Every structure is written in C-alpha cells, then in structure tokens.
Amino acid sequence: MLHIKCKDTDLDPIPVKIGIIGGSGLDDPDILENRQEKVISTPYGEPSDALIQGEIGGVQCVLLARHGRKHDIMPSNVNYRANIWALRDVGCTHLIVSTACGSLREQIKPGNLVMPHDFIDRTTKRSQTFYDGSATSPRGVCHLPMYPAFSERTRNILIEAAKELEIPAHEKATIVTIEGPRFSSRSESLMFREWGGDLINMTTCPEVVLAKEAGLLYGSVAIATDYDCWRMGCEGVNVQDVLKTFAENVIKVKKILVNAVGRIAKEDWSEDILNAKQCVCNNTMSGAM
C-alpha cells in the first residue's frame, strides 16, 4: 500500500521521475535510453502494459502505453487506477501525457496542439478514486478538490517547451471527456460548446483525477484531430481522419515532451510535490494514502 506522510516538512530537493502516458505513436520506447521493462501488479489489477523505464537526457522517466502497445484497450476499459498506481509505485513525481481530441472551437484547428487547464467529466462507467473501501485500498474517503485540475507549473513547462521549439500551441482549454467508444451526436457536440467546452476526448477523466489523488503533478498535451460534428454542413469525425491527423503531428508532441523533461529536471519541485501530497491528506477523512 502507498503511504503519504502528511506532516513532512523536509524541503531538501526531491529527485524527479517523470511518467509519460501516450497513445498511438507516443508509446515509442526509442525515446528512452538504458530502457528496461517492468511488469507491475497493483491492488487494482494490471496496468495497460508493462512499464518501460529509462532515461531522457539523463532524467529518469517511465513510459506507459495508455491503450496498450497494440492499442487494443478501448477508453472505457483502460484500467486508469492501475496505470496511475503503478507509475506512483515506481516513484514518479510527474505525469506528462498526450491525448487525441476533437475541437469544439473554430480557432482550434485540426493539427493544433493545446495545453488543457480544466475538464468536464461526462464519463459514466469509470472508477474515480483509489479510496473505494476495499480491503486493499487506502483508508478513508478522499473528497479531492479539482481546482486547479491540472498542475499549473507542469502545464507552464509544456507551454514554454512549445515556445522554445517554435511549435504553436493554445495555452488554455476546457476538455470534455465522454465515455465512448462512440463519438458524440450533433446535439451533444453543440451542448458541450454551450457548456464552455473547447475540446472533446475519451481519456482525460478519470486519469487527471487519479493522478491528483496520487499526489502526482499532471500536465497534458492535446492534439486536435478533427472538429467533432458541431459544424453545420460538414461531415462529422471519423477514425481515419483522426489517425491521419494524429500521425501528421505526433512528432511535434514528442519534441515537446522531451524538451519538457529537461526543463522539469532543472527545477526544484520539492514544495510542489509535498503540497500535492498534503492536498490529498487534508481532504481525506479517517485515513491517509
């Protein structure tokens, strides 16, 4: 079982270890040096695939394919709890992830990159917490505040990485996560726009929630692959267009993630890491993770 010390005031530099969660094209182990596979079992079952541990520029990193390396796990069936638990268990302090999404805004064009800052959860079948009352879960009930939803400092690292590489990126967006695997109806797509959604995908929730509950600093790079189906007079989203646009832009995301790893490693994150853990402790009743 994982444990977090709720009153740890030791602010000596804490070594960072960065988890990278990717989809198709972003689970390439060649970005890691000195790589080794590690198979992990968790109290919540098996992760999507083996963890691949290694280094990027001398920085300890762990790669995990969200949908498995064969991309044979649909979004509803991803074991998000096992994925996050496994990455936390091997010592990750940060998670930087990629996600394909549809655009709900004219100005976010297919092929554009976006750093989401908030979410709307429309999933229906997914476990949202480690504190589920089972014999192997942490004790208590965690009422986790989800503002801010993402680690602002990690988000800013990703934004600065894109700027240094001269890769245009939208710096804010609210992402709607639907259950899938189907795409939205037109009425749903229009409704999400009215709600303030800018992007739509199938994986951010509960991944971002569980990462925060595990005390990890989470940031995401989203690739807009299509306009969903809200635009009148236009064909809706289809898988072939999604895959084509994703493949055309995946190298840009890889460059941003690699650059961000180096930037994260240059800074002292001790206070952020301890504050993230303290947030969990402060909002857990009758126990701590």
Swiss-Prot record:
Which residue positions does UniProt flag as site: Important for substrate specificity? S184, V239
**Cellular location of this protein?**
Cytoplasm; Nucleus
Q: From the UniProt record, list the reaction(s) this protein catalyses.
A: S-methyl-5'-thioadenosine + phosphate = 5-(methylsulfanyl)-alpha-D-ribose 1-phosphate + adenine
Q: What is its main location?
A: cytoplasm
Listed binding positions for phosphate are: S24, R66, H67, T99, A100, T203
GO cellular component terms given for this protein: cytosol; nucleus
Alphabetically list the UniProt keywords.
Answer: Cytoplasm, Glycosyltransferase, Nucleus, Purine salvage, Transferase
**Which biological pathway?**
Amino-acid biosynthesis; L-methionine biosynthesis via salvage pathway; S-methyl-5-thio-alpha-D-ribose 1-phosphate from S-methyl-5'-thioadenosine (phosphorylase route): step 1/1
Q: Which family does it belong to?
A: Belongs to the PNP/MTAP phosphorylase family. MTAP subfamily.
Q: Which HAMAP family match?
A: MTAP
Protein name, UniProt field: S-methyl-5'-thioadenosine phosphorylase
Q: Which organism is it from?
A: Drosophila pseudoobscura pseudoobscura (Fruit fly)
Taxonomy of origin reads: Eukaryota, Metazoa, Ecdysozoa, Arthropoda, Hexapoda
